């Protein structure tokens, strides 16, 4: 199943594609693709992680509020409520996501210095540090 939407936010709008694919083990794979056109200077400063980590948190909330993850996750999925978002576990998640999105940027051809600056900015925006 596929669902195409237009995602609007203060910085602009872009296409959002959600795809649900059944897996052989009875679970369902959710794929999300959000495309945003960003100013080159903004992207150089933030990289993909600044926007992507917001989606990571959203998908974590979805996983925490559904039962499907029980079959595939080795540990309980945290609920990203306001208290959790201010805590140390959230900080570890945000830092890990920022590192992974920087690695994705490097793999896509962004130079490492720019990607690592974006990683730092992503952490700063989401954690205030």
What are these regions (language model features)?
Residues 1-27, 33-41, 127-128:
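Hydrophobic-ligand binding "helix-grip"
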Residues 35-129:
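Terminal "cap-and-tail" regions of soluble proteins that handle hydrophobic small molecules
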